[in-house]
Amino acid sequence: MAETILIETKTAGGNCRSYLMAGASYLGILCFVPLLMSRDDEYVYFHAKQGLVLWMWSILAMFALHLPGIGKWLFGFSSMGVLMLSVVGLVSVALRRTWRLPLISHVVALI
């Protein structure tokens, strides 16, 4: 059987600050703001760790540009993947849910 892509783990019970911090987690380098400032909020920390992995993936994709031949393709596909997963993360914050993103959740579990 196919595993579902979005897995709802829990709902958030926080305030507006928690939602803004969780949303900032998926906006590139801004993932460090909630990661450093909201370690005590489990909801924000969950999203911050996923945002950190997405940011690291985008940095690695930039290094792929230096590969001759396949670098531009690899960068393009990686950038599209990061963009789509960031949008899914922002949607999960807008719906006040925590969804484990595919491909990312395995790396987040190691952090």
Swiss-Prot record:
Tell me the superkingdom of the source. Answer: Bacteria
Q: Which GO terms describe its cellular component?
A: magnetosome membrane
Task: Provide the record's note on post-translational modification.
Answer: Subject to cleavage or degradation; identified by N-terminal sequencing of proteins that are about 103, 92 and 15 kDa in size.
Topological domains on the Cytoplasmic side lie at 1-17, 72
Q: Which family does it belong to?
A: Belongs to the magnetosome MamF/MmsF protein family.
Task: Relate the protein's function as given in its record.
Answer: Plays a role in regulating magnetite crystal size; partially redundant function with MmsF.
Q: What is the name of the protein in this document?
A: Magnetosome protein MamF
Its lineage reads: Bacteria, Pseudomonadati, Pseudomonadota, Alphaproteobacteria, Rhodospirillales
